[in-house]
Amino acid sequence: MNTKITNFSFDKKNLSLAEDIIKKYPPEGKRSAILPLLDLAQRQNGGWLPVPAIEYVANMLEMPYMRAYEVATFYTMFNLKPVGKNHIQVCTTTPCWLRGSDDIMKTCKEKLGIKDEEVTKDQKFSLIEIECLGACVNAPVVQINDDYYEDLTPEKMEAIIDKLRND
């Protein structure tokens, strides 16, 4: 996985999509497109945002790089280093912890053979402990890429990993 990216630009399809996104905002408020454009850049780049992608989006929105960087570092949906094909985010905030998220995290570490904030050697999985996913009523909760998995047990988590491993 190339972590030394020195240049970034949207491909033709994403550039058109980015322009359509920006048009949804008034000209004086186009900076408000920062979240969807960073997300678009991250998706184009395999699930993470290198500095050149953040710079590119900031320039496109005519805003200082540092403002775009602040947004990218504030939200856990943005990854500033490479992640696996299946990016597993385990919520460990109090409601999830009370319902066993520590066991879910332990299961993931043991099953994948990695620690928090690591990627498996085959780059199929990455694991990170995060704060609230906003689904406390169904704790413990894990987000894998764009999907939520709720009311988990260690056994259910193992089955999910096995299924993803075989996909």
From Swiss-Prot:
Cofactor(s) in the UniProt record: [2Fe-2S] cluster
Protein task: NDH-1 shuttles electrons from NADH, via FMN and iron-sulfur (Fe-S) centers, to quinones in the respiratory chain. Couples the redox reaction to proton translocation (for every two electrons transferred, four hydrogen ions are translocated across the cytoplasmic membrane), and thus conserves the redox energy in a proton gradient.
One MF term in the entry's GO annotations: NADH dehydrogenase activity
CDD domains assigned: TRX_Fd_NuoE
InterPro entries in alphabetical order: NuoE-like, NuoE_dom, NuoE_N, Thioredoxin-like_sf
Family, as annotated: Belongs to the complex I 24 kDa subunit family.
Residues holding [2Fe-2S] cluster: C91, C96, C132, C136
EC class (word): translocase
Lineage top rank: taxon: Bacteria
Record EC number: 7.1.1.-
Name assigned to this protein: NADH-quinone oxidoreductase subunit E
Record keywords: 2Fe-2S, Iron, Iron-sulfur, Metal-binding, NAD, Quinone, Translocase
